[in-house]
Amino acid sequence: MNTIRGLVLDERTLAPKLGSGVGGLSGPVLRPVALAAVFAAYRATGLPIVGVGGVETGAHGLELIAAGASAFALGTVLFADPEAPVRVREELEREASARGFATPLAAYAAAHGGPPPTPLRRVA
């Protein structure tokens, strides 16, 4: 989940603030949408997924891993915090350990409560 379409109106004129009208909404507001997308994609396919959308902390990354992402990426947070990758990695390790996981990837698909589904196979 990179962005979803959004619209912001000028409070005074009630005209769109962007010349094109709509733009991309990103950041923390996307996290629940990204989690739902990863959860559904994992359940449907079992294929490797890179979770993207609203990750600002290690706890957020661990949520995506638990939902079925085998990796996650940072986006909007980098504008405000260029050091976020280092911080998030450290937080991720602490969050996993605090929840009893030996490593962050040990939490992989924990939200699904069972073994990974069989990935879809290509039909010739």
For the regions a language model picked out, list residue spans one by one.
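Glycine/Thr-rich beta-alpha phosphate-binding loop at enzyme active sites
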Residues: 1-47
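Glycine-rich phosphate-binding active-site loops on the catalytic face of alpha/beta enzymes
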Residues: 1-7, 54-55, 59-88
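C-terminal helical cap(s) of enzyme catalytic domains, especially alpha/beta-barrels
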Residues: 9-23, 65, 77-102
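Short glycine/serine/threonine-biased micro-segments
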Residues: 22, 49-52, 73
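Glycine-rich beta-to-alpha transition loops that act as phosphate-gripper elements at the mouths
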Residues: 31, 47-59
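Extended, intrinsically disordered, low-complexity segments
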Residues: 31, 86, 90-124
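Contiguous, function-dense segments enriched for cysteine-driven chemistry
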Residues: 37, 69-72, 76, 119-122
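Short, well-ordered coil/turn segments that N-cap beta-strands
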Residues: 45-49, 69-70
